[in-house]
Amino acid sequence: GGRIPVKILLEKDLPGCPAEAFYETDGMLSVEAEHFICNEKADAGAFYVLPEYGKTLSGVKAYPQTKTFFEMAEQIRQAPKLTYQIYVREAGEYEMICYTAPANPVCQGGSVYFGCAVNGNAPQKIEMIPDGYRSGEPSCAEWAKMVVDQIRVVRVQVTLQSGENEIGIYAGTPGFLLEKLTFVRKGKHLPESGLGLPERRRTNR
């Protein structure tokens, strides 16, 4: 039989990288939704893992599923929260790409959103529906792509520090269901892929 070469990436130098953290390679990293380090319940509800949901591993969604957990930015900290731990070599601007269920607002012009905080800073309200979006209309390119791909992609600009970072994701409207987070350093290009960038996790083995 023939031989098939297989390349295995080994990271030897990860100073200060916590055990089990997800780490960056060539300016990019991914984390599956269920791989949070902390799941903080709120008085109004909590996040739950939906096994085998979506394109890769699973999804996470807050319940009660009809609940809107906040409306104003100053209310975000009252919502259920997931915390993710990531490690990057270089401080700077990164694009956080959120892969979510293909949710539509309940009415035209409506809103679907969640909250995000980086390293304990003030959380921001992240709107998932772009201006001019019209669900159910073939002339709306954003809607048509979401239907074909069966996923919604939301891009958020974040500032990360060198080394360990904590990303907080807060429940918002009922339509928010997270499948994966990907981070891409400014100036880097994420290759096109149907399943997205695979995650890399440090182990002690």
Enumerate the language-model features and the residues they cover.
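Extracytoplasmic
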Residues: 1-205
